[in-house]
Amino acid sequence: MVASRDTAWLLVGQVVAAHGLRGWLRVKCWSDFPERLTEPGPRWLQRDSDPEPLLHPLIEGQFFPAKGLYLVRLEGIPDRTAAEAWVGAKVLVPASQRLPLEPEEYHYSDLIGLAVYHQGRLLGHVSAIWAAGQDVLEIATPDKRQVLIPFVKALVPVVDLEKGELQVQPPPGLVESFLGQDRARN
């Protein structure tokens, strides 16, 4: 089943590999609601080449702690060959299924792509969020490097979704080299 072109989507994960011979997928979770990858129900997959997401209901899923990934089994993906065809695909749910949040909580999908500023200077853009006990923002700098900053109020005091930006106040020394402010060493 192909989704309607009018549907807005939430990214909940991305297929990173096939797993085993029976059509299981390894999925990187991009949602702060991991049950989206463990509880059965409708999910959609979309490759870059697909004009619209395709329905592949979740049969079962589990967290795979050794790799920090989820193993999921979806309808219509019966074997490894079929699973390999979906590597790189996005796992989606309709935006109408967005779960309510408390104040100062954010959906990962709202943070990805935000401009990141430090003392008024563009540091880069949020390229990923690592769920590592405490969420960590991965920031891609214009010169193709990455900076990791824990997503805590003390270090990320301003998140402005309307402006599409956030401001960081990391400890001294963490980002200066990425902004061209290296100090001379003795």
Curated annotation (Swiss-Prot):
GO terms for biological process: ribosomal small subunit biogenesis; rRNA processing. Pfam families: PRC_RimM, RimM. It comes from the Bacteria. One of its GO terms (molecular function) is ribosome binding. GO terms for cellular component: cytoplasm; ribosome. Residues 103-174 form the PRC barrel domain. Its main location: cytoplasm. Coiled coil: none annotated. It is found in: Cytoplasm. Keywords: Chaperone, Cytoplasm, Ribosome biogenesis, rRNA processing. Binds ribosomal protein uS19. Belongs to the RimM family. An accessory protein needed during the final step in the assembly of 30S ribosomal subunit, possibly for assembly of the head region. Essential for efficient processing of 16S rRNA. May be needed both before and after RbfA during the maturation of 16S rRNA. It has affinity for free ribosomal 30S subunits but not for 70S ribosomes. The PRC barrel domain binds ribosomal protein uS19. This is Ribosome maturation factor RimM. It comes from Synechococcus sp. (strain JA-3-3Ab). The gene is rimM.
